[in-house]
């Protein structure tokens, strides 16, 4: 029995940046540092930051006056930003720059009075933050999750209409929704390239290749990680059993019955240390070889805020 590791896998530039912001803030200012929402959707990462003194909250009313707060990689609404400013909280923004790009698209649409349609998952913090950039009551922003949702849209005119997408969606599903939107609203405008981020795209492409050569695909990632869930779904759609696991403790040995090659990947918020712990555990269950799938190299780096960067250089 062998293991085939997907490439690329694991941390993306936005996740690296977000974790660095929390760690540097703790190093410079000391604990506690408050973080609004899980900075990234991975239990192992969050538990590690908690141990260093990060305090995770869901709303700013849980943050004491005058404290330091970090916004998660998923981004926040303008209302949250205004509340932080009103209360005089010291803010470090860990919003992924690729999410910020979508925020700017929404803000421009709001300012111009253009109706906006966001393709995304209802209730996901990125979606909540993105929709919260729109405040034009004379137009409006609407959420669709699927092709079926398009028929329910309360939008009759295609004039001054634009769309954008959550950054961690299924490429295939999103393409279907965009095609259906353009069919219903031929004049709808959108980004030249969809907003699904490079890391999501690369990891989904790697899973396609992984599934072709595996009888089981294990995706290392937490249950609340959107991009990790999409990886597991994609492998399943290709006819290969897939499991989303937080770590080796989640592996059921019965999954390995009749399996010759186990494909392993990791969501963009899952650290490589977890992947290696899964590999080592599988070796105790009969794995004898480990190889890497060829894939694209990622060199993207996002800088931390200047105040933290100066300290980092020192």
Curated annotation (Swiss-Prot):
Question: By its UniProt entry, which InterPro entries does this protein fall under?
Answer: LytB/IspH
Fetch the HAMAP family from UniProt.
Answer: IspH (MF_00191)
Task: Provide the GO MF annotations for this entry.
Answer: 4 iron, 4 sulfur cluster binding; 4-hydroxy-3-methylbut-2-enyl diphosphate reductase activity; metal ion binding
Q: Which family does it belong to?
A: Belongs to the IspH family.
Positions that bind dimethylallyl diphosphate: 41, 74, 124, 225-227, 269
The gene it comes from is ispH
Organism source for this protein?
Actinobacillus pleuropneumoniae serotype 5b (strain L20)
Q: Which domain of life is it from?
A: Bacteria
UniProt-listed Enzyme Commission number(s):
1.17.7.4
Question: Which residues does (2E)-4-hydroxy-3-methylbut-2-enyl diphosphate bind?
Answer: 41, 74, 124, 167, 225-227, 269
The record lists the catalysed reaction(s) as: isopentenyl diphosphate + 2 oxidized [2Fe-2S]-[ferredoxin] + H2O = (2E)-4-hydroxy-3-methylbut-2-enyl diphosphate + 2 reduced [2Fe-2S]-[ferredoxin] + 2 H(+); dimethylallyl diphosphate + 2 oxidized [2Fe-2S]-[ferredoxin] + H2O = (2E)-4-hydroxy-3-methylbut-2-enyl diphosphate + 2 reduced [2Fe-2S]-[ferredoxin] + 2 H(+)
Q: In which pathway does it act?
A: Isoprenoid biosynthesis; dimethylallyl diphosphate biosynthesis; dimethylallyl diphosphate from (2E)-4-hydroxy-3-methylbutenyl diphosphate: step 1/1; Isoprenoid biosynthesis; isopentenyl diphosphate biosynthesis via DXP pathway; isopentenyl diphosphate from 1-deoxy-D-xylulose 5-phosphate: step 6/6
Q: What is this protein called?
A: 4-hydroxy-3-methylbut-2-enyl diphosphate reductase
GO terms, biological process: dimethylallyl diphosphate biosynthetic process; isopentenyl diphosphate biosynthetic process, methylerythritol 4-phosphate pathway; terpenoid biosynthetic process
Task: Give the note describing cofactor binding and stoichiometry.
Answer: Binds 1 [4Fe-4S] cluster per subunit.
Which co-factors does it depend on?
[4Fe-4S] cluster
Q: Which positions bind [4Fe-4S] cluster? A: 12, 96, 197
| Positions annotated as active site in the UniProt record | 126 (proton donor)
Protein function? Catalyzes the conversion of 1-hydroxy-2-methyl-2-(E)-butenyl 4-diphosphate (HMBPP) into a mixture of isopentenyl diphosphate (IPP) and dimethylallyl diphosphate (DMAPP). Acts in the terminal step of the DOXP/MEP pathway for isoprenoid precursor biosynthesis.
Per UniProt, the enzyme's principal EC class comes to oxidoreductase
Q: Where does isopentenyl diphosphate bind?
A: 41, 74, 124, 225-227, 269
**Which keywords fit this entry according to its UniProt record?**
4Fe-4S, Iron, Iron-sulfur, Isoprene biosynthesis, Metal-binding, Oxidoreductase
